[in-house]
Amino acid sequence: MFAPLLKKLFGSKNEREVKRMLKTVSIVNAFEEKMVALSDEQLRGKTAEFKERLAKGETLDQLLPEAFAVAREAGKRVMGMRHFDVQLIGGMTLHEGMIAEMRTGEGKTLVGTLAVYLNALSGKGVHVVTVNDYLARRDANWMRPLYEFLGLSVGIVSAFQPPEEKRAAYASDITYGTNNEFGFDYLRDNMAFSQEEKFQRELNFAVIDEVDSILIDEARTPLIISGQAEDSSKLYIEINRLIPRLTQHIEEVEGQVTQEGHFTIDEKSRQVELNEAGHQFIEEMLTQAGLLAEGESLYSAHNLGLLTHVYAGLRAHKLFHRNVEYIVQDGQVLLIDEHTGRTMPGRRLSEGLHQAIEAKENLNIQAESQTLASTTFQNYFRLYTKLSGMTGTADTEAFEFQSIYALNVMVIPPNKPLARKDFNDLVYLTADEKYAAIIADIKESMTKGRPILVGTATIETSEHMSNLLKKEGIDHKVLNAKYHEKEAEIIAQAGAPGALTIATNMAGRGTDILLGGNWEAEVAALENPSAEQIAQIKADWQKRHQQVIEAGGLHVIASERHESRRIDNQLRGRSGRQGDPGSSRFYLSLEDSLMRIFASDRVKNFMKALGMQSGEAIEHRMVTNAIEKAQRKVEGRNFDIRKQLLEYDDVANEQRKVIYHMRNSLLAAENIGDTIVEFRQEVLDATISQHIPPQSLPEQWDVAGLEASLASDFAMKLPIQQWLDEDDHLYEETLREKLLNEITTAYTEKEDQAGIEALRTFEKQILLRVLDDLWKDHLSTMDHLRHGIHLRGYAQKNPKQEYKRESFSLFQELLESIKRDTIRVLSHVQVRREDPIEEEARLRREAEELASRMQFQHAAAPGLESEQLSEEGAEVAVAAAPVRNDQKLGRNEPCWCGSGKKFKHCHGQIE
């Protein structure tokens, strides 16, 4: 009730923050005259002075005004660009660990230099994170002269970079790279076998460009390093032949069945479900195909894998469409990012869905993979001591940024007021009427000489629009994932008078559409242009620029609304940069997916009440409100999905932290002998307690079982029954001591044979390998648990609580298994002295072989419906490690040593 009054009296929180920062801006401006008077050498020397002051106890906050003044002056001298006052506010926002929302063309890249320079003074490193390699290289090379002028080093990390080059990049004061590469390097570091192999330092401060894209759109995408699993390509092909025989079951709203079928599709949640008839029919077909035994059920425990394949095939055929969710290029299925319209090379759908699409498209089916290490962007970026970001559209997601990342959003005032006109949406009954209206708008704008950008949600729509324009004889350019290599060229001239560009959502995030076209691109196209040619190109551009401004600037036409208001705002933001004139209009129809699924009934009834005729449009605030309400509903649902996924992943994340801390401690330790002694004692105690329960009577002892366990776990054949027969005073405690002495003596003899130093090195290698192998199996077990945990809801149990409880139990088992398996391998192994040079060369060869056989990919985000985790088709960023195969014994065969373990878990790890 009082909120509007208080806001009027004191201003919004954002306005109060801006006022607070303006006081600091005044202090920065007061330093300007002093900085102008400094020579280049003196200005450069300020960096060393700041570092010295930090070492003496000053804080970065105390240095901020003077450091910003230094960065501003350096920008003027090196780049020819002076930071505006509002850009200083943006820099302060980033330094304070917030998200700066700045409109298109307000100079986000330049804003970043202020916070990056200030925080790099600490010497702990700053990471500048971008969405792709092109932007990382462009921004790093663009700003490198500024940072190097100020005495700071700049590095770029990228995929397939030589290890030494990558380590040097991470050791730099400022490191540029993509979110994927930073995340993968974190996982690689936690699979390293020595400190020297690691890349990253402690994660200090990150500035994320297009932060909404990375922390919101990519939040559900796990980063995974994986190894190859067994080949199931024949099964995918067989099931792909059966799926087209299934038909969809359709019901009207009143519950009237209009088509009997085998499965239902829920478009809102993007789920497909087999009904009873569908289950029966698919089981019959699988039995006829010889894939399911006669009388067997798909729901039998040993057939659940087959059921997963059936659902993957069904989703591939019914939910994933060519040129909408993916394209086929060079014999590969390339996924399309729904938020940007760009292809995502290397990214694959999980749970067999990608293979099912490959089978559908008659392509070569790539092998499935097994997870070796994983994390999510949500959990990776929360590891930084301080996090900040920049984007043109964050305010609509402010609640999510705050609740998940503890990041506040600051809307930075524009340097010049916005002059763009955003017209109300026009809604038509059919898509054909909508396209006819768009073409009429295009023709009208072209006669005025205005550049036009038509935004579409899919490649399919962009190509349909292009075909309509060809029929009308209208010249245009198409920009979508199929023609992404021409992106820079098309965007450069999209602002020329009368230029018409049809684009998916990829339309130039990170690039500006300049009114009149881009004169710099014209100059770059010439070989050794003369000063006269450059001057002429500039003069011609100035005329075109003025012509476009007088015509009304860039006109943005959207062919439909996206599920997210943020994506719509990004498209609008292409027009009206830095106070330029412009306009935007959204054209919709009741046949659009958003309208059909979420908003159609109310709007359709409203249009019927008005008695609308074919070709007529409705332009009313009620309609716009209904659409925005539908978008908020979708955004809220997607937020719930991301939040719920995070709650589940947080469980795995806590375990990941423990394992990675254990691993890093091992790598850092010179000697793990004491750890092995502790492990040996704990494993022995547990083994004895299993067969001789504490405070039990001798009649209850399982001596034969204890002898067998000691032979299996410690490679010790000890005559315990004989000892007991010969010594009446050998009780439980004295027996424990005797066994420990025997086992310790045997291991000491091993030390004497191999040499203490060699054995300590060997112990570390074995413990690391056992830990990695068991962690990999644990991840797989956790994955299976997560897939089926929603079923606990039917037993009136809370799936999240059950998941936490069972995960904890599994983790306890993992920690015990690490100890037990390490001791088992070390006890069974036969050691010999090895020449130190030979040993080092062997370890190096193994490390190089491991590195050369690793591969990386990305997998799609799982969707959640209420408590159900549906991770079929989850997108993943994945890196695959080698699978070792022994020539004599299969990895899954029993080990020759008689331990009862599989060869891969025993001597297969060290031979």
Swiss-Prot record:
PROSITE patterns in alphabetical order: SECA_MOTOR_DEAD
MF terms in GO: ATP binding; metal ion binding; protein-exporting ATPase activity
Xref: SMART domains: SecA_DEAD, SecA_PP_bind
Membrane topology: Peripheral membrane protein
Binding site for ATP: Q87, G105, E106, G107, K108, T109, D512
Gene Ontology cellular component terms for the protein in this record: cell envelope Sec protein transport complex; cytosol; plasma membrane
A GO biological-process term: protein import
Keywords, ordered alphabetically: ATP-binding, Cell inner membrane, Cell membrane, Cytoplasm, Membrane, Metal-binding, Nucleotide-binding, Protein transport, Translocase, Translocation, Transport, Zinc
InterPro entries tied to this protein: Helicase_ATP-bd, Helicase_C-like, P-loop_NTPase, SEC_C_motif, SecA, SecA_DEAD, SecA_motor_DEAD, SecA_preprotein_X-link_dom
Signal peptide (UniProt feature, chain positions): none
Enzyme class: translocase
Listed EC numbers: 7.4.2.8
Predominant cellular place of this UniProt entry's protein: membrane
Reaction(s) catalysed by this chain's protein: ATP + H2O + cellular proteinSide 1 = ADP + phosphate + cellular proteinSide 2
Residues that coordinate or bind Zn(2+): C895, C897, C906, H907
Localization of this protein: Cell inner membrane; Cytoplasm
Role noted for this protein: Part of the Sec protein translocase complex. Interacts with the SecYEG preprotein conducting channel. Has a central role in coupling the hydrolysis of ATP to the transfer of proteins into and across the cell membrane, serving both as a receptor for the preprotein-SecB complex and as an ATP-driven molecular motor driving the stepwise translocation of polypeptide chains across the membrane.
Entries under HAMAP family matching the protein: SecA (MF_01382)
Protein name stated in the entry: Protein translocase subunit SecA
Originating species: Pseudomonas putida (strain GB-1)
